[in-house]
């Protein structure tokens, strides 16, 4: 394997433990010596504090890293666990950033989504400025459901935040003109942003490197003056999400900005000429007043229909019978019902649908969406 300079690295059975952001994979012939050298360094060098294992697992100390690596039994890496007792098998199943150390830093902030969702999304690479929790804590959130079930690491009160220096290290490697989604597992404008400003600083960096950013948020703060002054209209794409126009109803199931403020933020950004879309996500039966929806002053709307699993059904007021189609662990509404809903949306110049069900995705791509190759329908400005 090719070697790249790093302060310290060891590879065993395909898993790499490293210090720093650069990786050096040892040739097989030198692996045994590398492991011994690493073990000696871990146990004797008290200055090593940021050894990590690929799969985005942090260790609190060099001794923890050494214990993880050398505590495996005959079952090999599949039996290994990190300091929190999470097995490698679960780490392979969970999205990047779901497993973190006990520190406040969020290291799994950069992820290219694969699988069912990744194969359909035109912008599969996401940058989460915050992770392992979201202050909006929506009842229907699939990321919350996934992380809670696999690791119990979801903490909406104390979410973790990415280090801006590490973000810049990643962004330097991203080709100019790429569009990254800001906020994949969590909302990049959740309440902690008003304290940490990681998203604000990330936007500044993306401007510097000519990288586009697709912001998906339930917060009205994206239209605050300090963000308006920073966002580049050629690079910024904003989608502001709501599920209802009833502020009281929304407050029962999410801790985001009141929908009335989100509508105002959408209309403000539209008037300023930004590429903005009103995002009905997810659409929940009986929650939307279509008269109010069609009065929103925005050219574009994106619709994403609620998908559920047994956990979401148990904590959310929906009827299982309304979701007759099963795919990839989720239950979906019928295509006929989705089309009925879409026929009521008349107040926007362009309506597009984001859908994870394969059959429905293909239908909307081929027969409905204005941009077949991009269900987000972004306005791309080329110089």
Describe the function of each predicted region.
Residues 1-98:
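Intrinsically disordered, charged low-complexity linkers and terminal tails
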Residues 98-102, 291-383:
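Auxiliary Fe-S-binding modules of radical SAM enzymes
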Residues 207, 228-232, 263-273, 343-349:
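Surface-exposed amphipathic alpha-helices with a cationic face
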Residues 185-187, 218-220, 241-245, 281-285, ...:
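Active-site beta-loop-alpha junctions enriched in small/polar residues
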């Amino acid at each position: 394997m090719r070697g790249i300079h790093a302060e310290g690295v060891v590879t065993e059975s395909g898993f790499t433990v490293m210090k720093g952001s650069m990786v050096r994979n040892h040739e097989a012939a030198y692996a045994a010596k590398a492991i011994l050298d690493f073990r000696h360094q871990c146990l004797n060098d008290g200055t090593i504090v940021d050894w990590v294992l690929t799969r985005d697992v942090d260790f609190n100390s060099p001794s923890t890293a050494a214990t993880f690596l050398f505590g495996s039994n005959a079952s090999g890496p599949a039996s290994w666990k990190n300091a929190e007792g999470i097995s490698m098998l679960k780490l392979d199943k969970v999205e990047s950033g779901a497993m973190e150390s006990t520190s406040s830093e969020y290291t799994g902030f950069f992820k290219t989504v694969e699988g069912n969702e990744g194969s359909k999304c035109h912008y599969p690479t996401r940058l989460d400025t915050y992770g392992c929790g979201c202050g909006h804590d929506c009842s229907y959130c699939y990321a919350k459901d996934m992380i809670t079930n696999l690791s119990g690491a979801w903490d909406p009160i104390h979410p973790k935040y990415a280090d801006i220096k590490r973000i810049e290290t990643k962004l330097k490697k991203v080709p100019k003109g790429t569009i990254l989604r800001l906020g994949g597992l969590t909302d990049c404008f959740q309440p902690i942003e008003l304290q940490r400003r990681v998203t604000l600083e990330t936007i500044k960096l993306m401007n510097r490197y000519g990288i586009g950013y697709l912001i998906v948020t339930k917060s009205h703060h994206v239209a605050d003056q300090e963000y308006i002054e920073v966002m580049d209209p050629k690079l910024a794409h904003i989608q502001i999400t709501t599920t209802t126009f009833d502020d009281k109803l929304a407050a029962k199931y999410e801790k985001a900005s009141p929908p009335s403020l989100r509508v105002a933020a959408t209309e403000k950004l539209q008037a300023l000429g930004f590429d903005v879309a009103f995002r009905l996500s997810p659409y929940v039966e009986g929650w939307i007043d279509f008269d109010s929806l069609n009065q929103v002053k925005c050219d574009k709307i994106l619709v994403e229909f609620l998908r559920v699993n047994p956990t979401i059904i148990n904590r959310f007021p929906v009827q299982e019978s309304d979701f007759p189609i099963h795919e990839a662990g989720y239950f979906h509404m019928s295509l006929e019902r989705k089309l009925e809903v879409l026929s009521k949306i008349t107040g926007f110049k362009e309506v597009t649908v984001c859908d994870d069900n394969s059959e429905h995705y293909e239908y909307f791509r081929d027969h409905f969406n204005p941009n077949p190759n991009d269900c987000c329908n972004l306005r791309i400005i080329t110089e």
